[in-house]
Amino acid sequence: MESPAVTFTLAYLVFAVCFVFPPDEVRSAGLTVQSLLAAWLGSEDAAFVQYHLRRSTGTLLAHSLLPLGYYFGMCFAAPEKHLCFFYLASKEWKTFFFFAVLLPAVSSTMAYYWSRKGWNNHPLARTLAVYALPQSGWRAVASSINTEFRRIDKFATGAPGARVIVTDTWVIKVTTYCLHVAQQQDIHLTVTDSRQHELTPDSNMPVQFLTIRVASVNPYVKAFDIRLNSAEYGELREKLRAPISNAANVVIHQSLSDLFLETFTSLVEMNQTYSVPSTQELEPCIGCMQTIANIKLIKNCQEPNEGECQQCYCRPMWCLTCMGKWFASRQDQQHPETWLSSHVPCPTCRAKFCILDVCIIR
């Protein structure tokens, strides 16, 4: 039978790992630093920068207490070691206790120093100060980031301990102990590595993860790496102003929907075209409101009264990209081999059509 000390050590090790790197089950139970210190941290949506100033500091303090917690637990799990009486403990345990006390002491000193003068000494505040105008301070930059973070059009991905956020102006990486920030107009982005995982909890298909180096031309801003699923690469590029170079010649695998959209577009371009009457004025696509509608559904695959497809009488209201996305969204995600031959309803009138019925307006 295992001794209580061994059992406690294994249990505490599991607890410490789950506390530092909390899985979804631990997060849902509220056993994280963010949940335990929620009243002090405030709202991330209301004040993103201020929230992470406190979160990084609180996380450092909380994690620094773990060795001391283990020592106190061993006082009860192994009473024969006399850990409750420091002068009776062995030399090894005295050394462990010394470092277990020193770690939170140093962390507390750092936290106190960072919080002085309204968090002016925090590493994040110093990074933001680099981007501040001469007549303003880091708080003006923080206010800009807070405003952009509240917008719904930002790009955000990743687990809470390794999040990547891209706004109109900023590229942000959130880690356990710090926040990396770089201004889009000052950065160079390079794909440096890729890893492929054959099995993932959310999909039965291989998943590719890309590592992208974010380097600022400003020497006072430290470079950092972001990691994301290759399926999100296209969305990231749309949000970035700077191009992404591929120094490692990495073959980037697109998502299944992106691959289908390319095939859908190439097949539609081979269909017959449609000419609108001179009196008809085309309006913006109701899907994206950015591109002029350039698609008309006309039954071409079979005779008018044959087959599953139906004639659509809607005026042109969609662009090719949005129609392709609509077509893909109506498919069985587990059977992509059936996508090209399937029939879907018109997004407006519900008349069924296939790829052969999609005509580009010339």
From Swiss-Prot:
InterPro entries: TM129. GO terms for biological process: protein ubiquitination. GO terms for cellular component: endoplasmic reticulum; membrane. Pfam families: Tmpp129. Residues 1-28 form the signal peptide. GO terms for molecular function: ubiquitin protein ligase activity. Residues 79-94 are cytoplasmic. The chain crosses the membrane at residues 58-78, 95-115. Keywords: Membrane, Signal, Transmembrane, Transmembrane helix. The keyword Repeat does not apply. It comes from the Eukaryota. It is found in: Membrane. Residues 29-57, 116-362 are extracellular. It is a multi-pass membrane protein. Belongs to the TMEM129 family. This is Transmembrane protein 129. It comes from Gallus gallus.
